[in-house]
Amino acid sequence: MMEFVYPHTHLVAGVDEVGRGPLVGAVVTAAVILDPAKPIVGLNDSKKLSEKRRLALFDEIKEKALCWSLGRAEPHEIDELNILHATMLAMQRAVAGLSIVPEFVLIDGNRCPSLPMPSQAVVKGDSRVAEISAASILAKVTRDAEMATLDLAFPHYGFAQHKGYPTAVHLQKLQEHGATEHHRRSFGPVKRALGLASN
C-alpha cells in the first residue's frame, strides 16, 4: 500500500463511519482533527485493535485531539434515504459539529459527501491516515456502547455480541421475536421478518 501524501494544509480532519452493514441502530460517524504537538501512539484501523486497546485510545483521542465530533443517521433516516445517502448525511453532521473548521477533510472509502471545504476520499484510509484511524475508533467505540445499551433493553437479540450485524444468531432471533423499533425496515432480513418483502 502506497504511503499517503497529506495535503499541504494544517487543519486536516479525518472522517470515518461504523455501522453500514448492521440491521439495527444508527450509522455512526466521527470527525477528528489531531494535534501535531500531542501525538497518539498506536492509531490503527479500529477493527484491527482489541476492544481494550480501542477503549484506551478512545479516551486518549478525546483528550489530545484539537477537536472531535460525532455524527449519526438514525434507522428511519436510513430507511428513507438508503444507507449510502444516510452515511453521507452522518458524515456531514460530524464535520459540521467540529468546533474548529477544518481546511481539508479526508474521508475513509471511495466517496465524499458534499462539504463546504475541500475533501478527498482515501481507500483503506482507516489504516493509512492517523486522523481517519482516530475517527474510526471514536465511531466504533460509540456505536458498540449503543449496542450494549440496546442489548439491555432487548436482551433476546444478542446485540452486545453481534452489534446488529446479520449473523446467524441475529437472523434467528429476528424470526423468533420479530423486529424492534430500532431495526432498519428497508433491509431485506428485517423486511422478511416483518412480512413486508415482496417475493
Swiss-Prot record:
GO terms for cellular component: cytoplasm; ribonuclease H2 complex. InterPro entries: RNase_HII, RNase_HII/HIII, RNase_HII/HIII_dom, RNaseH-like_sf, RNaseH_sf. The gene is rnhB. Its cofactor is Mn(2+); Mg(2+). It holds the Pfam family RNase_HII. It is found in: Cytoplasm. This is Ribonuclease HII. GO terms for biological process: DNA replication, removal of RNA primer; mismatch repair. Endonuclease that specifically degrades the RNA of RNA-DNA hybrids. Keywords: Cytoplasm, Endonuclease, Hydrolase, Manganese, Metal-binding, Nuclease. NCBIfam families: PRK00015.1-1 (NF000594), PRK00015.1-3 (NF000595), PRK00015.1-4 (NF000596). A divalent metal cation binds at residues 16-17, 108. Belongs to the RNase HII family. Residues 10-199 form the RNase H type-2 domain. It comes from the Bacteria. GO terms for molecular function: manganese ion binding; RNA binding; RNA-DNA hybrid ribonuclease activity. It catalyses: Endonucleolytic cleavage to 5'-phosphomonoester. The keyword Manganese applies. PANTHER family: RIBONUCLEASE H2 SUBUNIT A, RIBONUCLEASE HII. Manganese or magnesium. Binds 1 divalent metal ion per monomer in the absence of substrate. May bind a second metal ion after substrate binding. Its EC number is 3.1.26.4.
